[in-house]
């Protein structure tokens, strides 16, 4: 019994860090938003989506309590990176799509105060077929250059 309890206790930090969500055959894993500076007017959100089903679906929107929330993709053309608005992200059967720095990401725009480490940002992902999925972005410290200081 002691071995079982010790094993269970060892897993608790991992379980506490994991925050996954699912709707139908879609799994959304580890949504995070990056901590911002005091003057930042936007921040980026990241997560991974896996379609475990037999049919394609599309992520067609993200809602959160900010003046504007948009899906973007970073595109590099002639050595210059730019953000392109995405109306939808296609999720083929068996496919995993990662929203990450330098690729797909969610922009939270019009911040009135900084996002701070440990804060939780409620949001809703809207899928064409699976419908709405409420998730929570956990705010983490800035570890690498991201889009926190972009003004769109």
What are these regions (language model features)?
Residues 9-10:
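Hydrophobic alpha-helical transmembrane segments of integral membrane proteins
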Residues 1-4:
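Positively charged n-region of N-terminal signal peptides that target proteins for export
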Residues 13-15:
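N-terminal signal peptide c-region/cleavage motif recognized by signal peptidases
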Residues 19-152:
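Compact, glycine-rich, soluble single-domain proteins
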């Amino acid at each position: 019994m002691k071995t079982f309890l010790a094993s269970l206790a060892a897993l608790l930090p991992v379980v506490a860090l994991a925050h996954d969500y699912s709707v139908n055959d879609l799994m959304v894993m580890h949504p995070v938003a990056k901590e911002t500076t005091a003057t930042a007017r936007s921040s980026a959100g990241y997560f991974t989506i896996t379609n475990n089903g037999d049919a394609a679906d599309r992520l067609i929107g993200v809602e959160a309590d900010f003046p504007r929330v948009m899906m973007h993709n970073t595109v590099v053309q002639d050595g210059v990176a730019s953000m392109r608005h995405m109306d939808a992200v296609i999720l083929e059967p068996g496919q995993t799509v990662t929203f990450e720095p330098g690729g797909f990401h969610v922009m939270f725009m019009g911040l009135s105060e900084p996002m701070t480490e440990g804060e939780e940002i409620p949001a809703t992902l809207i899928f064409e077929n699976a419908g709405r999925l409420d998730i929570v972005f956990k705010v983490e410290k800035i570890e690498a250059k991201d889009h926190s200081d972009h003004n769109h």
